[in-house]
């Protein structure tokens, strides 16, 4: 399988997806036809989100079709060379994909060789479940099971920082809560600016920041770019 799982879409001082374009170009390998899954973008229309994505990828020669705009979404996915899943609210994303019957077709086409690109919520959707999202559960997705394209859980936008005077939990504390009730999980705290690529059977960490892996009963393990999972 070929996956590009990004923690986030925007970095300080850079345009939207600018940091991801070289990574996307490297993994295209001749693929040019993409379907875009825009449903996580709650505060923007599907048309606007799709147009924004299409404009960014046009210089790479990639044509983007919003899955919401086609007559037969399942057939469009089955024939796609690239599946792109945008960030936003993970619960809304999973709900819409489940209701529209898109989860199995996405899994199947990626396993057959299509490239999967997802940022933030799109990276969460590639995991076994969405239980490591940071998002508010604004809708009920009728279960947390997701695509299971990547075998570990990703927590995108990972940071352990708290504003001065803030008394809420750190991100690690919230991850530790999940590991109490689901000790079988391995959770990757993927900070902004980092990504995971899957190619030729290998998953590789990229990006300038330290990533952390959490397991029940163990100290967090720091990982740097180049680590293979």
Swiss-Prot record:
InterPro entries: Class_I_gatase-like (IPR029062), Peptidase_S51 (IPR005320), Peptidase_S51_dipeptidase-E (IPR023172)
Localization per record: Cytoplasm
Domain of life: Bacteria
GO molecular function per UniProt: dipeptidase activity; serine-type peptidase activity
Enzyme Commission number, as recorded: 3.4.13.21
Catalytic residues, chain numbering: 120, 135, 157
NCBIfam families in the cross-refs: PRK05282.1 (NF003642)
Function recorded in the entry: Hydrolyzes dipeptides containing N-terminal aspartate residues. May play a role in allowing the cell to use peptide aspartate to spare carbon otherwise required for the synthesis of the aspartate family of amino acids.
Name of the protein in question: Peptidase E
Gene encoding the protein: pepE
């Amino acid at each position: 399988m070929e996956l590009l799982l990004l923690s986030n879409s925007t970095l300080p001082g850079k345009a939207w997806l600018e940091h991801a374009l070289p990574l996307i170009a490297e993994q295209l390998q001749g693929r040019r036809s993409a379907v875009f899954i825009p449903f996580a973008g709650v505060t923007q229309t599907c048309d606007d989100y799709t147009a924004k994505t299409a404009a960014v990828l046009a210089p790479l020669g990639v044509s983007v079709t919003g899955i919401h705009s086609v007559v037969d979404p399942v057939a469009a996915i089955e024939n796609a060379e690239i599946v792109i899943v945008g960030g936003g609210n993970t619960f809304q994303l999973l709900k819409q994909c489940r209701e529209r019957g898109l989860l199995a077709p996405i899994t199947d086409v990626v396993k057959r060789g299509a490239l999967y690109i997802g940022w933030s919520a799109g990276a969460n959707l590639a995991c076994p479940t969405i239980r490591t999202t940071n998002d508010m559960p604004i809708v009920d997705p009728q279960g947390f099971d997701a695509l299971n394209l990547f075998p570990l859980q990703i927590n995108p936008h990972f940071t352990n920082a708290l504003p001065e005077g803030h008394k809420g939990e750190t991100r690690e504390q919230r991850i530790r809560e999940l590991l109490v009730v689901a000790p079988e999980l391995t959770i990757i705290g993927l900070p902004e600016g980092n990504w995971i690529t899957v190619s030729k059977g290998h998953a590789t960490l990229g990006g300038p920041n330290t990533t952390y892996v959490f397991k029940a009963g163990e100290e967090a393990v720091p990982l740097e770019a180049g680590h293979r999972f």
